[in-house]
Amino acid sequence: MFRYSKRLMTALLVLVGLTAAACSTASSATTAGACPPQKSPVVTLAAYSTVYDVYGKLISAFQDQWKQAHGGQQVIFQTSFGGSTTQAQNVASGFPADIVALSLAPDVEIIQKAGLITHDWTTDPDGGIVATTPVVFDVRPGNPKHVVDWNDLTQAGLQILTPDPSQSGGAKWNIVAAYGASLRGKVPGTPATTSGAQALLTGIFKNVTVMDKSANDSLKNFQSGNGDVAVTYENQVLTAIAGGKSDQEVLPPSTVLIQTPTVVVDRNARKHCVLPIANAFVQFLHTPDAQTIFQTVGYFRPIDPAQAQKGIADLKQQPVQDLFTTDDIGGWDQLVNTTVFGPNGAFTQALKAAKG
């Protein structure tokens, strides 16, 4: 039997409703008569750790729209939040998610390889990406350690928090951000070569004191007083600041644009007779209404990289001098399998050197 990990939470159970529209309007992927009428269909969402609040708002907005359009039928959402890679592994191992909201594309591929996502999710609107945000530094008030760029993370005695890349998608983004900035020749004193990027990562990870299970755990650890700087999602820092926390954002001159996909796990959704609802929810995330929620509640940037680079003044998002994507530095397949996370990749070797 599949067991929930301690970081997985279930929430947002709303119990009323009347119709069976979810199954009676099933797509061609669901055979006629296969789904009995459902009074209150249940959709399960597994998501990465830092989007709890924004997905609560998105789910509520979708439920209202669905109810109005489908004769008062109330859709129930069960949600689970944790490190992105851990979530993907759990779904591949049997957690019955109908939809996954993950930090990065390679985590979706874990579920694809398990045969649970059978469609080409990259043909969805915006290539399946629903929200974006850059990697930034979260520092103490006044930035007493004067951390402004990636090379500053190598200074002697600095204490850095970043999650564990074996469990957290955000951790992988943090590593790719430093690697890419170096490779693009944007880090002072660091050669724009693979060896230069590896040396930078070695220096950074010599100063990493804690690698938590998720970006959310890492930020909470930092907010409890541990460390001098946390490397994390910008939207996470801005959300904390908006909530009255003393976090302070430092946006490095060169950083990666995190692109987060949300995808229907179609084999599960079909089995649970909620495929039309799951599809509708994912499509809803690309609408102007949902994108406004992502930006004003979640402090994400616009999906378009050019617009994301400019930032949004009202949300206190600064422009980025050099905002790049994974495609600009070889793409995820190359980054995961060879150049960064492969057996001889820059991070793999840097971590060995840092520990040695």
Language-model segment annotations:
Residues 186-253, 261:
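Ligand-binding pocket segment of bilobal, Venus flytrap-like solute-binding proteins
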Residues 29-168, 309, 347-348, 352-356:
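N-terminal segment of the mature folded domain
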Residues 24-26:
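Bacterial signal peptide processing site
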Residues 142-148, 167, 180-189, 268-278:
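Short helix-loop capping/hinge motifs at secondary-structure junctions, enriched
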Residues 19-22:
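C-terminal motif of bacterial Sec signal peptides marking the signal peptidase cleavage site
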Residues 2, 269-356:
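Extracellular/periplasmic juxtamembrane helices and adjacent flexible linkers that interface
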Residues 46-48, 120-130, 139-140, 159-193, 204-208, 241, 245-256, ...:
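Short beta-strand->loop
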